[in-house]
Amino acid sequence: MNSVFVYCELEGTQIEEVSFELLTKGRKLASELGVKLEAVVAGHGVKGKVESQILPYGVDILHVFDAPGLSPYTTRPHTAVLVGLFEREQPQICLMGATAIGRDLGPRVSSTLTSGLTADCTALEIGDYEDKKNKKSYENLLYQIRPAFGGNIVATIINPDHRPQMATVRSGVMKAEVLDENYAGQVVYEDVDAFVKPEDYVVQVLERHVEKAKNNLKGAPIVVAGGYGVGSKENFDLLRQLAEELHGEVGASRAAVDAGFCDHDLQIGQTGVTVRPKVFIACGISGAIQHVAGMKESGIIISINTDAKAPINELADYVIEGKVEEVVPKLIKFYKAHSK
């Protein structure tokens, strides 16, 4: 029970951004606990290509599994790799991205190891817990924090008796930061056949189609986001015009998506995308916990709302009281007149 593990996802031989974010958080947790940070990567043709990507994030030990059957991802081989590795290494904590792969792999591993898992965490901390009923005290547990009950509360979930403590985190929730470009971590090239049986390769991927992203919400310097208060699909088009004028991207709250004002791929928040733009313009957004979780680290937040007491206004740097359909056209007109 002496390490924090991060499962690193791959696209070809390139580590996914969410894994860098988790390595950064994993390094902080490991340092606080006084244990090693370990990472595991499984793919094909990755030897010699992933080490320089992963070690600079402060990884003490990198476990590399390289075999043709490990790429593209399929459930059983990767499950066998993690289960076998965790049974041998006995980690305290395992972090994964809340991605299509993480949502498939995480439950498989936690179920096999009977360890439990908390999905879509918005924060991870180390803390103690006292079980007054059973008169037990626990130290250095992983606090797995996430919105619950429809986003009305923020729950802190712990796993005191089973290991590893497993959590998934959405891309963008944590911030990726290189610790040391020359960090001297150890690399272990594992024997894949010792972990994966031939029958684990029963599923083969015959063909893959990768869609290009429809937007660049995560990388946009300016985001114009709309909520239920926008009022209609037609009014939502005004936000697109403003975003185009500002060279930004359009986003939305879950309420706006559920109302049919826009597609789900624009959703920002706990069940959508996490963004960190320099400027975030919230139009008709009330400020539910789940939405705020996806945009609270924006540089400047501007709220346009008819409700002066809307929760989003407490977070905003500037508040414009008024109807979206009246305020936004004025902003568009102003920027058209003054843009170079």
Where are these regions (language model features)?
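N-terminal glycine-rich FAD/FM-binding segment characteristic of electron-transfer flavoproteins
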Residues: 1-340
